[in-house]
Amino acid sequence: MNVKACAEYLKKNDNYLIVSHKNPDGDTMGSCAALCSALRRVGKKACLYPNPQVIKKLLPYVEKYYAPDDFVPSMGIAVDVATDKMFAQGFDGKVQLCIDHHPTNSRYAKKLLLKPEKASCGEIILELIKSLCGDVTREEADLLYIAVSTDTGCFMYANTCSATLRAAAKLYDYGAEAAVLNQIFFRKKSAARLKLEGMVFSGMSFYRDGKISVVKITKDMLSKAGATNDDLDDLAGLAGMAEKSLVNVTIRELDDGSSKVSLRSSKEVNSSDICAVFGGGGHNMAAGCTINCPPDKAETMILDVINEVWK
């Protein structure tokens, strides 16, 4: 399905519940909210699934679109959700349309708008809104700027390309307050987050002459820093600050004792292939998985696979 066909499909239906993924980031939430706004502008009933895991800094931008308790949807739309295992709660068989940019999308929805060449879902939603409405409101521009900028690390990640920057420029022209949003999402941090980063950096490990960097975040570290879920956004970017690092591994201990692994890499290494060994996936240069063991063991396991794949 292309953008034009998706827009026509959305015009023919109604009563949409728009669904984000587990541990939602700026791309899934910004894209969901912008699409919701556009659908309402063309006379459709649309609401967001009120994902309980949304971090505090995102809430002011998205909670106005949350579905009320009595909302009964006729159709589910998943945005930036590569597989049905990534839903915040059970939506199996309830999603008719998926809009995504992950090349590993499992094609679980009846209809799929997939653009794996895009750095973010926000870029796809920008095209879709222009097809639906002809223009983009200032509020939608802010939401989509959040989406695009957070999925590209404020345009520092390798997934950023000329098309990404052109999309950001269009959003700026539509009124996105880029400078304000950059401060909120990339510069300002809580005291707990800064304490946690200090612990993370002091415990960073390096392998293969610094080409592989690994950081681990344990439950004990979170407790000592006084950090909450709101302080954990984009922890995966920390390992990549090492100057020689080509493969960056972030391992976070989850409440059940398992480890969430985020992997970012240069073009020489396929992150998605490595994470697929553990049932995960994502993009070539940014992927993730969950390993059912403590962080120390997860580090050994993921390093073994990296060294096997990257000779």
PLM features: residue spans?
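Glycine-rich oxoanion-binding loops at beta->alpha junctions
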Residues: V54-E63, A119
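Hydrophobic residues at beta-strand termini and immediately following loops
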Residues: Y49, I99, L113-L114, V215
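Glycine-rich, phosphate-binding/catalytic loops in enzymes
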Residues: L35-C36, G93-Q96, L114-K115, R166
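Short alpha-helices
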Residues: H102-A167
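Short, hinge-like loop/turn segments at secondary-structure boundaries
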Residues: K64-A67, L114-P116, S266-K267
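Short, motif-level signal for alpha-helix interfacial/capping segments enriched in acidic residues
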Residues: M1-A5, A78-V79, I129-S131
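Hydrophobic helix-and-loop "lid/oligomerization" segment in the mid-to-C-terminal part
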Residues: N2-P24, T28-K57, P68-M75, T150-V277, ...
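Active-site cofactor/cluster-binding pocket
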Residues: L59-K111
